[in-house]
């Protein structure tokens, strides 16, 4: 991803990689192959993923929409959108159930241009002959590889957070229930020896 100012135009550089035996018929084919490689490199870059992950956690929104016209217990979430940091655990779990049962379609949203700007800022070097090529590879990486992966990761993190909260709430509610006498107004004794 070195973008020197003196590097050749990407289309010119791609001419040297034309090889009909390998299925690379034109410079455009070679450039597409290079685009795929650069997109993979960007997608695998831990620093880029960390930046975009943090951006998604701060600015992302969860949206759920009804998949059909029928009424269900999930009607509250038929046209629902909430910032990720403000979602309550019970909302996440209900939305997940609604999606699993086929009543809801759920997506995690982040303004595409905001995500692409953060990616380009980390990668593109202004003035480089390859600048437009790198911008194109950034868009491909973001749309095809990075964002879908981050969306799945965000959903998984939300579900994990919601489940942990539900377990803690259950534990808090269970303790007093277990500590009360089994029969009200009667003393219960254990006579087992040992």
Where are these regions (language model features)?
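Duplex nucleic acid-engaging cores and interfaces of nucleic-acid transaction enzymes
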Residues: 1-188
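A short acidic Gly-Thr/Ser loop motif
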Residues: 190-194
